[in-house]
Structure formats: structure tokens, C-alpha cells
Amino acid sequence: DDWGIVDGHHLERDWSFPDFASALEFTNAAGVICEAENHHADFELGWGRVKAIIWTHKIDGLTESDFVLAAKLDRI
């Protein structure tokens, strides 16, 4: 999957994993990146899947920082 822009408001991407532990490991790694960037995505975690949702809360929309964070999450 790739990132999608939803309603011109936020970025979304889904990842698939072989099990819950792998999905959790990815989410934890993503959280470390979010903390380092001081820009925090919303995550939905389930068995073998993770969804990330990114937008800038201050403007209730997208900024360059959202795309930078998305690119960094792609490198995990």
C-alpha cells in the first residue's frame, strides 16, 4: 500500500504483518520516530495490521511536516 490523501485533510496508510507481534514492533518503532519529530500520528493496531493517520492538528489539515513524517515511517 501507499499513502493516500483523504478528503484533502489527512494522510493514511495501511501495513500488513504476519502476526500481532510484528505489527506492534512496527508501531513502537514508528512511535520513536514520532517522538523524535515531535509530530504524532494516530495509529490503529490490530492482529497483523497497522494504520497510520497523519495531519497537523494546529491547522486541522496537511503541512509539509506530515509528508516528511510519512516518508520517515516508510523507511521502517
Predicted regions and their residues:
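Long, contiguous binding/interaction regions
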Residues: 1-14, 18-24, 28-76
